[in-house]
Amino acid sequence: PEQNLLIKGLRLIREHYALPHLYISLHKQIPSGAGLGGGSSDAAHTMKSLNQMFNLGLSDNELEERVTGLGADCPFFVRNRPVFATGIGNIFTPIGLSLSDWHLVLVKPDIFVSTKEAYARISPRRPETPITDIIRRPVEEWKDLLTNDFEEGVFALHPEIADIKARLYDQGAAYASMSGSGSSVFGLFRTVPEETDMRRLFPESFYFQALL
């Protein structure tokens, strides 16, 4: 428990503010080892909640600065908005991106991807077209332009993850990608996929589907 990001976030707040004894219950629905920032979002939301509950008066900028010490991706979860991240992932530029009315399919196989190993295998490349320009284009044009540099190394280790991405495209996804360092893969669909059929394609995986 002492290494839990949620507990670390609570400690960060307690370094500067006197809080009463607390009972915190976490109902975790984001799968672990999925490349979805589950632990980081838990920590960020805990600090946001404490700020609101006890009227600590911390601005979003201050919260982002404080949670950076818990992990490079923690600040991203302080605000619910699309951003372009630079630095170590903690310097944000808001972007005008809306995926409203797109259908999201998320598939997380029973595979754990070591973040350390994923980083060791990465070959970063500067895209020919800046990412900020790519995302201004229609989603249907992202497929060959918007890439995840982690995929090459992770797919070599776990071809099953590459297969999930291919199957999402086969089922009509306009865009599909591994999330972060894996192992989950998401697809964006213009029309709603038949959920029963989709679940049959991924019987051993965590499956989630939603309208954005």
Q: What do the predicted segments below correspond to?
A:
Residues 22-35, 172-176:
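Short pre-catalytic strand/loop immediately N-terminal to key active-site residues, enriched for Gly-Thr
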Residues 56-94:
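Glycine/threonine-rich beta-strand-loop-alpha-helix active-site module
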Residues 6-9, 39, 107, 118, ...:
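Residue-level signal for inorganic ion chemistry
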Residues 34-62:
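DPxDG-like acidic metal-binding loop motif
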Residues 36-42, 174-183:
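Short glycine/threonine-rich catalytic loop with a Thr-x-Gly-x-Asp
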Residues 1-20, 31, 120, 140:
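N-terminal beta-alpha supersecondary unit
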Residues 186-188:
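Short hydrophobic/aromatic beta-strand micro-patches
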Residues 78-175, 190-202, 208-212:
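Conserved, helical-rich catalytic subdomain that frames metal- and/or nucleotide-binding sites
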